[in-house]
C-alpha cells in the first residue's frame, strides 16, 4: 500500500523511539513504536489496516493461541508467501500494538490480527476484515458484566453497518452474547466449542430473561434466542464438520480448551481458502505461545517506564532537542 508522507515519517520516528527504548532498557520497544506513530500520525490505524486482507481474532480467553494457530495455518497455504503475511501474535492487541506490527511490514498484503475486545468495532469499520473470529465473552470480574454487554452491542452495530461488505464471522455457538452479536453478520460459521459457557450466561443478551440450559445447549423461552446449529464442533480430539468431514487435530499445545481454539482457527482458515489438511500441518507446529499472564507481568514492569520514556521522547521532538 502507498503510505502518506506523514505516516512514513511517523513510522521512521517510531522505529527510532523503539531502538532508543531498547537501548535504555525500557522493554522491547513494540509499545512505544506504536504510540509514537499514533501520536505523530493520528490516522495511522485506518491507513495501515485498510489496504490489506484482514483476519481478526478476539475474545476474553484464547485469542493469542488462536491467532498463532491461524497464522500457522495460513503460512502453510500454498497460495500465500510467508513474507506477505504480518501478525501481532505476541499479544500487543490494542491500537498501538496493531499499528506497531503493521508498520513493520507495510508491504504485506495479508494481516492476521489478535484484537482486544475494545478494538473490534474499529477493525470491522476501518479494516473491513475478510474473517472475524469471535471466541468468547468471560465475565472474569463482576464489574466487567456491563462492559461486556456494551461491547457485544458495539460489535453487533458494527457488523450491521458493514452489511454484505462485512466479514464472515466464525463464532462460538455456545456463548449467548457472542451469538447475539454475531447474528448481525451477513454470514456466520458456528462452532460449538463444548464446554458450555453456563457460568457466564445467566441472562439473555437480547431480552434480559433467564436462559435455560440443557444437553442441547441454551435457549431463551421469552424471545426465542437459542444456540444455533453448529457447522463445526469438537469431539474428543477431532474437529468435526457439518458436511461429514472429520479432522484429527493432533496439536502440540496442551489443554482441552485449546482443542476448541484450534477448531475455530481451522474453520477460519478454511473460510480463507486454505485447504484444511494444509492448515493442520501448520497448526501442529505451534507450541505453547506466551500466555496472557506472562505478558501481563512483563507489561506491568515496563508500562510506567515506557510511558515516561514516550513523553520525554515526544517532548524532545517538539522542542527540537
Could you tell me what each predicted segment is?
Residues 27, 52-55, 248, 296, ...:
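Exposed boundary/loop context
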Residues 88, 252, 301:
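Thr-Gly-centered strand-to-loop micro-motif
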Residues 291-298, 302-309, 316-319:
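Low-acidity, Ser/Thr- and Arg-rich intrinsically disordered low-complexity segments
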Amino acid at each position: 500500500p502507498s503510505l502518506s508522507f506523514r505516516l512514513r515519517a511517523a513510522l521512521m520516528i517510531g522505529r527510532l523511539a523503539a531502538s532508543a527504548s531498547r537501548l535504555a532498557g525500557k522493554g522491547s520497544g513494540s509499545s512505544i513504536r506504536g504510540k509514537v506513530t499514533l501520536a505523530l500520525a493520528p490516522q495511522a490505524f485506518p491507513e495501515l489496516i485498510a489496504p490489506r486482507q484482514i483476519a481478526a481474532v478476539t475474545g476474553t480467553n484464547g485469542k493469542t493461541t488462536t491467532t498463532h494457530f491461524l497464522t500457522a495455518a495460513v503460512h502453510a497455504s500454498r497460495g500465500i508467501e510467508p513474507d506477505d503475511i504480518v501478525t501481532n501474535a505476541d499479544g500487543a492487541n490494542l491500537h498501538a500494538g496493531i499499528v506497531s506490527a503493521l508498520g513493520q511490514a507495510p508491504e504485506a498484503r495479508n494481516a492476521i490480527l489478535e484484537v482486544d475486545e475494545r478494538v473490534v468495532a474499529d477493525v470491522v469499520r476501518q479494516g473491513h476484515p475478510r474473517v472475524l473470529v469471535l471466541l468468547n465473552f468471560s465475565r472474569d470480574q463482576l464489574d466487567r458484566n456491563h462492559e461486556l454487554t456494551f461491547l457485544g452491542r458495539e460489535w453487533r452495530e458494527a457488523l450491521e453497518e458493514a452489511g454484505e461488505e462485512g466479514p464472515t464471522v466464525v463464532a462460538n455457538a455456545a456463548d449467548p452474547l457472542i451469538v447475539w452479536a454475531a447474528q448481525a453478520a451477513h454470514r456466520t460459521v458456528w462452532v460449538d466449542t463444548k464446554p458450555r459457557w453456563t457460568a457466564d450466561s445467566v441472562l439473555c443478551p437480547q431480552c434480559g430473561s433467564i436462559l435455560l440450559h440443557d444437553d442441547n445447549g441454551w435457549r431463551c423461552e421469552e424471545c426465542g434466542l437459542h444456540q444455533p446449529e453448529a457447522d463445526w464442533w469438537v469431539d474428543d480430539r477431532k474437529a468435526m464438520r457439518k458436511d461429514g468431514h472429520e479432522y484429527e487435530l493432533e496439536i502440540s499445545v496442551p489443554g482441552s480448551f485449546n482443542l476448541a481454539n484450534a477448531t475455530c482457527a481451522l474453520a477460519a482458515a478454511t473460510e480463507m481458502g486454505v485447504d484444511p489438511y494444509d492448515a493442520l500441518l501448520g497448526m501442529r507446529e505451534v507450541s505453547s505461545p506466551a500466555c496472557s499472564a506472562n505478558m501481563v507481568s512483563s507489561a506491568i514492569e515496563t508500562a510506567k517506564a515506557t510511558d515516561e520514556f514516550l513523553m520525554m521522547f515526544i517532548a524532545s521532538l517538539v522542542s527540537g532537542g
